[in-house]
Amino acid sequence: MNARRKKRLTLAVALIGGVAAIASLLLYALNSNLNLFYTPTEIVQGKKDTGVLPEVGQRIRVGGMVTIGSMVRDPDSLHVEFAVHDAAGGEILVTYDDLLPDLFREGQGIVAQGVLIEGGKLQATEVLAKHDENYMPPEVAEAMGQTHEKLDYNEQQKTSY
């Protein structure tokens, strides 16, 4: 092998190695910033179609309704714990160490984003509450729609509002 071919081969190997390194770093960065949406039932039992459970330490988003009577506040700090449930019966505990949104209430729909710290417990970094009685985050509405039966109202019920 002459010097010219050796130089080209070295350049080609270095170029392929550089592209592979950049691609792997890019995939790693995208994977670490990926937040998958789960319902409380999916966290406990796994995704319905695949049965895949989220891993401890994984960043996820959880949507559901705040269980009435489950909120516990620490009087000396901003720490709060509450349970989130869905219609299928799944329930997880959420801990949060910041100010809750003004519209946060028990019995309301929320989306909490954070890290799963143990089975059925989420350390939230962000809590989003719906902004009026008719709004529900799209992910929660879709997940709840899959597990809730649609209500049929008669004409009297529709006009009583």
Curated annotation (Swiss-Prot):
One of its GO terms (biological process) is cytochrome complex assembly. InterPro entries: CcmE (IPR004329), CcmE-like_sf (IPR036127), NA-bd_OB-fold (IPR012340). Disulfide bonds: none annotated. The keyword Transmembrane helix applies. GO terms for molecular function: heme binding; metal ion binding. Gene3D superfamilies: Nucleic acid-binding proteins. Heme binds at residues 131, 135. The chain crosses the membrane at residues 9-29. Keywords: Cell inner membrane, Cell membrane, Cytochrome c-type biogenesis, Heme, Iron, Membrane, Metal-binding, Signal-anchor, Transmembrane, Transmembrane helix. It is found in: Cell inner membrane. It is a single-pass type II membrane protein. Pfam families: CcmE. Residues 30-161 are periplasmic. GO terms for cellular component: plasma membrane. Its main location: membrane. Residues 1-8 are cytoplasmic. The keyword Metal-binding applies. Belongs to the CcmE/CycJ family. Heme chaperone required for the biogenesis of c-type cytochromes. Transiently binds heme delivered by CcmC and transfers the heme to apo-cytochromes in a process facilitated by CcmF and CcmH. This is Cytochrome c-type biogenesis protein CcmE. It comes from Shewanella sediminis (strain HAW-EB3). The lineage of its organism: Bacteria, Pseudomonadati, Pseudomonadota, Gammaproteobacteria, Alteromonadales. The gene is ccmE.
